[in-house]
Structure formats: C-alpha cells, structure tokens
C-alpha cells in the first residue's frame, strides 16, 4: 500500500495498492463529528520540535517535497477513515511511516495540514472553472457555463469523501472559511474580467459583490443538498440554479 496521486485527477491524492498494474481504491467512509482544535494540546510523546516557523515553509529540495506529499497523502487517507474532526498527527505519522517529529518539521499542527489540503482542492476548482470560462462570449453562454460549474461542483462534492469531510467537520473553523472566501473572491473577479468582454458597460462596482453572492450561495446550497440526499437533493439543486441563473440574467441584461 502506498500514497500517490490519482492517474485521473492530478490534484487528488489517493491511497492505493498496486496489484498486477491495477489501481485499488481505499473505501471511503462518511465522516462526522465536531472540529476540535488540537493546536494547544499535542498527543503524548509527540512534542513539537523547537524551531522557526520559516523551517516549515515549502521545501525546495526534491526529497523534502516528496516527504511533504507523503504527509498530505497520509492525512487524506486518515480523514477518509476517521474524519477530519478526529485527525491526529500521530495517526498521520503512523500512516506515512514517519516519526511525529518529522511531520512537525513541515506542519506545526493538524490544522495546517487540513488547510494545505483545502487549498489544493480550491486551486483545482479554480483551474477547472477558468478553463471552462475561456470560450464564453455571451450572456447566454455565461449562464450555461454557470450551470456546468455548479453541477460539476456538486458531482465533485458527492464523490470526494475527503473534501466533504473537511467541510462538514470544520464549519466552525474561521481560518478555513477565510481561505474559502478568498478563493471565492478570486473567482468572482475572474468572472468580472470575462463578462466585461461582452458586456462592456457592466457595473464594475457592483458586479464583484453580485458574483460573489452567487458563488457562495451556490457552493453552500450544493454542500447542503449533498448532505440531505435523496429526492430533496435534486430539487434543491434545480431550484438553486434557477434562482442564481435568474438573478444573474436580470443583472446582466439590465446593462
């Protein structure tokens, strides 16, 4: 068994075993629980080495990068098994085959590891969204793009247990929400730049907030619908998309 990147999604790290050239996925488990910070209390016998925080910044040497990747892969596997709320540095160290002290050389606590994983997911979403945005050249094309983005995000949330666990177990964590909001603002500004190409008189002072509201509403409702599941899930998705599409259609066509 080893931790590696998916051959299908370069931004997703998976736990796999290779048998006769085949990839065998580890079964995902739905996570539940309440996020409890461990930044103030480390596990017994795993005291954090002293040192400047600069030593934990992204390493430049290939070997160090590989070890960081190994830690993140192990963390994702642990989250799949026990949820983000129960994640411990000692479990990550054991899963990666490294000592606790070695993990602390790269991350000062589990919160930093969770943040690193989330930032990877968000970078992946942003890259996919901006690629889809490239050929958009009209209001109608933008609204179709919007539907594709929302349904694509829904499928990702539904199929990626690790991403789902991070969000469902850590909604009370302000730092995580701040990272997400910063990424949403980044996407909103990308929308403004694109839409101004075919709506030159777009109200640039209003558009970022309008787009940001639509992005955050869509993301939140998507995650809630996945948690509810069943027939209600589809109803919520369809109604949310109709609402956001209608709001944006009115805003853009008023120019």
Q: What do the predicted segments below correspond to?
A:
Residues 139-144, 159-189:
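Short secondary-structure transition hinges
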Residues 70, 78-112, 116:
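Helix-turn-helix
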Residues 71-79, 121, 125, 153, ...:
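Short hydrophobic clusters on alpha-helical segments that form packing/core surfaces
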Residues 4-7, 13-82, 91, 95:
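Basic, helix-initiating cap at the start of DNA-binding domains
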Residues 116, 130-158, 214:
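Hydrophobic alpha-helical connector segments
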Residues 129-137, 164-171, 222-229:
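Secondary-structure edge/capping motif, primarily at the C-terminal ends of alpha-helices
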Residues 114-121, 128, 183, 187:
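Alpha-helical DNA-contacting segments of helix-turn-helix folds
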Residues 197-244, 255:
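Hydrophobic/aromatic-rich alpha-helical bundle segments in the mid-to-C-terminal region
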């Amino acid at each position: 068994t080893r931790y590696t990147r998916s051959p299908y999604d370069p931004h997703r790290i998976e736990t796999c075993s290779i048998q006769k050239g085949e990839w065998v996925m580890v079964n995902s488990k739905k996570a539940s629980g309440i996020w409890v910070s461990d930044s103030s209390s480390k596990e017994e016998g795993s005291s954090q080495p002293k040192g400047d925080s600069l030593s934990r910044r992204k390493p430049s040497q290939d070997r160090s990068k590989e070890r960081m990747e190994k830690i993140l892969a192990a963390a994702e596997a642990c989250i799949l098994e026990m949820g983000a709320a129960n994640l411990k540095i000692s479990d990550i160290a054991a899963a990666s085959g490294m000592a606790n002290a070695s993990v602390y050389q790269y991350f000062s606590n589990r919160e930093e590891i969770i943040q690193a994983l989330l930032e990877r997911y968000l970078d992946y979403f942003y890259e996919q969204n901006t690629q889809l945005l490239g050929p958009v050249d009209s209001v109608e094309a933008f609204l179709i793009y919007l539907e594709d983005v929302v349904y694509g995000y829904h499928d990702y949330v539904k199929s990626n247990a690790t991403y789902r666990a991070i969000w469902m177990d850590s909604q009370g964590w302000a730092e995580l929400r701040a990272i997400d909001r910063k990424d949403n603002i980044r996407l909103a500004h990308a929308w403004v730049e694109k839409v101004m190409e075919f709506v030159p008189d777009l109200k640039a002072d209003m558009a970022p907030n309008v787009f940001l509201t639509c992005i955050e509403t869509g993301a939140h409702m998507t995650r809630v619908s996945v948690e509810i599941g069943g027939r209600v899930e589809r109803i919520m998705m369809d109604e949310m998309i109709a609402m956001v599409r209608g709001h944006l259609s009115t805003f853009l066509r008023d120019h």
